[in-house]
């Protein structure tokens, strides 16, 4: 990657909040030849959630002899774009680190995937401190320091120890000889002990040059010597001093109080590393041999605990802790006064450990930023900072104050990875955070002069199109990733939709655009920083590197692209450690449009691997796509999701994520929003000039109480019944009005007059149904035959009408329609007779005679029409009817 490309990428960092990237402490390396670790590595304790880009194995400090070749190894969680190594010579400890040129005679760098190896020839100019630097796009991650030291062994004050020691003790005593006090070795020497020139096995290991003989006897008498060996160089040193020990029988010895022998220390001071085993040895002899009691005024329960063991003159404490530091007293008493007290001062050193890592949010350019880094360790660790691999001491805007880094004015060049290092003589520990810088918006320059006056026909200045931030990429599966981006707060043109574009890194690789339109949603900001969005991209190829960008489409149908993301290498899932899976505990009904998710992690889950969580939700009745929400921070255990539909059941699932991968989904869990609450509070009356601008939501518009619904339904039924009643009454009145027409044909009259009213009457009266039985007169058949013959010869005969006389029965209510039709035909036939019917029907005869007189010139065709009856109950007992029975 060229310097220009690196600079451009530095201004377009990942925008979603990435938590600190802990640099794990050193794990055992594979030194070449006789190289040995200078200090054992302390356990790794990641101090903060990691986005997946971190140092898995930092180079380890080594001690090697001159002319040897050593190998420093560095491994990262993801394959970087490139590795670099820097060096600071031990000849100039105050100087800064310088990047090494690879391929030289004294340093050779090789890379295999995510592992880089530096081969160094041990020379005086190659001794010093080394760092491994991994480049991940705009991010620069630096490892902790590895020291390369020269193996050495030397004697101190050798002349004073040339004369041999001569001790005479009674049998049964324990003897402590410190033969290695004059030796200085790097690394610590290993010891061998000899009696009369024959090597003997010591009772305790790790005595650091102290020979301890317990319960001596006459067989223990002899000449003792010791030898130190450097484990790195193999160099051996035979100490000139020796011990002549003479053991006498206890019966021949006179009584003596406990006392120290010549050359034995009156007090001791021991320094040990936390986690190691501590062995305290008590010097002193007496006659008879004294009894030893151990105690400590500083450490409560120092002797009587599971980690402590007493072996007479020896006290062993395993897995030493910091609170084990203090003064220990060895009290010796044999009944002869005075008793002997021996004091041993114990110091427990602790490697540095960062307990409060730095944390940086999105910071505006020009703002003041204060980062804190708190660490523990014995001795108290020194804190220093790196900004994208460069020391903060060289930055003019940076100030160091105790555990704080203060940037008085955040600039674009500060964007990147900020690391805090805690250092003491036992080693280093590191943690970092991603510093995101929101650049200042460049305003269009105005014309110089006084008040700006718009030119004629010049419209208002168009709003700017503010692009979204570069997306942050998280692996979801072997073929898909999740993108997160943000639209910073602005007053520019509103965004309508987003499109996601991606391309595979390589020559002649074009940008691909996904088919999905990602809506902007409601025009409001989710937080003070802006509004965040997420989208997934599928159908990718594993073990390939991609870049992503976001295309924003604005309300003026124009579009603008975000800066491209950093290179993202899509690793297969088999190469990644599984992420902790969250467990959904409860879906709390928060309000009518919101719920709160509550979840937990397993007790053995490593929370430091998590950057945040993805929440997926959709209505339970839907089989469509899930809505997504991003929850930042590994410590989050609850999250409110809104807005949702009122009184609707939803299903939810969670997964944790980091920049490298995402976990499996949690089990589905259902929950619902609250039902609407009925309120009896009266709405305030709007005054003149006031207007209620509240717009009800979709759910509130159609949400009615059951009582109101029943009232409206009952009213609708009553209205329908009233309309039906009115319709029947009107129809009855129309039937009556049609019956009063004198010119209406007789067939229609009879139908209308005898239409039953029982079907449409609102109130039905219970009355006995009256049946009318009509029997035709035999004379009517003869009259009908004569009438038909006349009709054939005379088609134009006029009609004459004479009122007919009927008996009226006011109690008659109903009549059979079929009987009425037969009666009608009978009456019409009877009207055509000649009137000589022997007086059976006087009314008909009168009508016929009247008709002949009024029209003498016409043939005698007479049709009798009955006038309108005054009631629906009639007694047809005259004319051509023979009998009427009711």
UniProtKB/Swiss-Prot annotation:
Gene3D superfamilies for the chain: Immunoglobulins
Keywords recorded for this protein, A-Z: Disulfide bond, Glycoprotein, Heparin-binding, Immunoglobulin domain, Membrane, Proteoglycan, Repeat, Signal, Transmembrane, Transmembrane helix
PROSITE patterns referenced in this protein's UniProt entry, alphabetically: FN3 (PS50853), IG_LIKE (PS50835)
Topological relation to the membrane, as annotated: Single-pass type I membrane protein
Effect of residue 509 to E: Loss of Heparin binding
Disulphide connectivity of cysteines: 74-132, 179-226, 282-330, 373-420
Cytoplasmic-side segments: 731-886
N-terminal signal peptide: 1-20
Fibronectin type-III domain segment(s): 467-573, 581-676
Biased composition (Polar residues): 671-684
Region (Disordered): 29-52, 432-475, 668-697, 734-768, 781-886
Function noted in UniProt: Mediates response to the active Hedgehog (Hh) protein signal in embryos, functioning upstream or at the level of patched (ptc).
Family that this chain belongs to: Belongs to the immunoglobulin superfamily. IHOG family.
UniProt subunit comment: Homodimer. Heterotetramer; 2 iHog chains bind 2 hh chains when facilitated by heparin, heparin is required to promote high-affinity interactions between hh and iHog.
Name recorded for this polypeptide: Interference hedgehog
Biological source species: Drosophila melanogaster (Fruit fly)
Gene (UniProt): ihog
């Amino acid at each position: 990657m060229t310097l220009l490309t690196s600079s451009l990428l530095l201004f377009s960092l990942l925008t979603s909040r990435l938590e600190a990237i802990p640099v794990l402490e050193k794990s055992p390396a594979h030194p070449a030849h006789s190289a040995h670790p200078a200090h054992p590595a302390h356990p790794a304790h990641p101090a903060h959630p990691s986005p997946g880009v971190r140092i898995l194995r930092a180079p380890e400090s080594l001690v090697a002899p001159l002319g040897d070749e050593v190998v420093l190894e560095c491994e990262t969680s993801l394959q970087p774009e490139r590795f670099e190594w820097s060096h600071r010579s031990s000849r100039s400890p105050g100087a800064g680190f310088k990047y090494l040129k690879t391929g030289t005679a004294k340093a050779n760098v090789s890379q295999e995937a995510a592992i880089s190896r530096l081969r160094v020839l041990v020379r005086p100019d190659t001794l010093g401190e080394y760092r491994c630097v991994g480049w991940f796009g705009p991010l620069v991650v630096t490892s902790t320091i590895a020291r390369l030291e020269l193996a050495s062994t030397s004697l101190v004050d050798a002349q004073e120890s040339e004369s041999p020691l001569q001790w005479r003790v009674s049998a049964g005593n324990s003897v402590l000889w410190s033969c290695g006090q004059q030796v200085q070795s790097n690394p610590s020497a290993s010891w061998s002990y000899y009696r009369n020139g024959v090597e003997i096995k010591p009772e305790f290991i790790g005595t650091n040059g102290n020979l301890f003989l317990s319960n001596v006897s006459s067989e223990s008498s002899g000449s003792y010597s010791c030898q130190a060996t450097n484990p790195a160089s193999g160099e051996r040193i035979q100490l000139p001093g020796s011990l002549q020990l003479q053991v006498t029988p206890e019966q021949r010895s006179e009584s003596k109080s406990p006392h120290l022998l010549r050359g034995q220390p009156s007090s001791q001071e021991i320094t040990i590393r936390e986690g190691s085993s501590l062995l305290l040895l008590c010097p002193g002899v007496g006659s008879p041999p004294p009894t030893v009691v151990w105690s400590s005024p500083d450490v409560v329960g120092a002797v009587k605990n599971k980690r402590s063991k007493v072996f007479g003159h020896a006290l062993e404490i395993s897995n030493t802790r910091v609170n084990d530091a203090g003064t220990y007293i060895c009290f010796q008493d044999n009944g002869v006064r005075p008793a002997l007290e021996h004091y041993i001062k114990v110091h427990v050193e602790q490697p540095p450990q960062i307990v409060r890592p730095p944390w940086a949010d999105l910071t505006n350019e020009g703002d003041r930023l204060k980062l804190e880094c708190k660490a523990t360790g014995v001795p108290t660790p020194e804190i220093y900072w790196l900004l994208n691999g460069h020391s903060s001491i060289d930055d003019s805007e940076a100030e160091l104050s105790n555990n704080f880094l203060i940037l008085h004015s955040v600039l674009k060049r500060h964007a990147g990875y900020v690391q805090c290092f805690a250092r003491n003589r036992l080693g280093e520990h590191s943690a970092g955070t991603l510093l995101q810088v929101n650049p200042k918006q460049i305003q269009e320059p105005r014309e110089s002069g006084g008040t700006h006056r718009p030119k004629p026909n010049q419209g208002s200045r168009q709003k700017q199109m503010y692009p979204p931030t570069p997306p942050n990429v998280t692996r979801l599966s072997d073929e898909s990733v999740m993108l997160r981006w943000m639209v910073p707060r602005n007053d520019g043109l509103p965004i309508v939709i987003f499109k996601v574009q991606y391309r595979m890194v390589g020559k002649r690789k074009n940008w691909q655009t996904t088919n999905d339109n990602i809506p902007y949603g409601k025009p409001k900001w989710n937080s003070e920083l802006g509004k965040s969005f997420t989208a997934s991209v599928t159908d990718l190829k594993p073990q390939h590197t991609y870049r992503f960008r976001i295309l924003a489409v604005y309300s003026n149908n124009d579009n603008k692209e975000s800066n491209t993301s950093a290179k993202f290498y899509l690793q297969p899932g088999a190469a990644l450690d599984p992420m902790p899976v969250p467990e959904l505990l409860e879906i709390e009904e928060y309000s009518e449009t919101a719920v709160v998710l509550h979840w937990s992690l397993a007790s053995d889950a490593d929370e430091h691997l998590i950057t945040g969580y993805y929440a997926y939700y959709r209505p339970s009745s839907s089989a469509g796509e899930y809505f997504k929400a991003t929850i930042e921070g590994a410590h989050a255990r609850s999250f409110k999701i809104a807005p949702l539909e009122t009184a609707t059941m939803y299903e939810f699932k969670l997964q944790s994520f980091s920049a490298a991968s995402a976990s499996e989904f949690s089990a589905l869990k259902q929950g619902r929003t609250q039902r609407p609450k009925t309120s009896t509070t009266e709405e305030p009356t709007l005054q003149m000039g006031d207007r209620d601008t509240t717009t009800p939501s979709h759910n509130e518009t159609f949400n009615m109480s059951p009582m109101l619904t029943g009232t409206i339904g009952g009213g609708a039924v009553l209205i329908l019944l009233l309309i039906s009643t009115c319709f029947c009454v009107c129809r009855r009145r129309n039937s009556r009005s049609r019956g009063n027409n004198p010119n209406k044909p007789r067939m229609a009259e009879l139908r209308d007059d005898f239409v039953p009213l029982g079907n449409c009457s609102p109130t039905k009266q219970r009355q006995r149904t009256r049946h009318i039985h009509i029997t035709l007169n035999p004379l009517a058949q003869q009259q009908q035959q004569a009438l038909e013959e006349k009709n054939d010869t005379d088609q134009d005969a006029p009609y004459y009408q004479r009122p007919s006389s009927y008996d009226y029965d006011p109690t008659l209510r109903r009549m059979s329609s079929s009987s009425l039709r037969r009666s009608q035909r009978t009456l019409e036939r009877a009207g055509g007779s000649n009137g000589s019917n022997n007086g059976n029907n006087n009314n008909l005869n009168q009508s016929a005679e009247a008709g002949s007189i009024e029209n003498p010139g016409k043939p005698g065709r007479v049709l009798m029409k009955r006038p309108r009856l005054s009631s629906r109950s009639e007694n047809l007992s005259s004319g051509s009817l023979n009998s009427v029975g009711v």
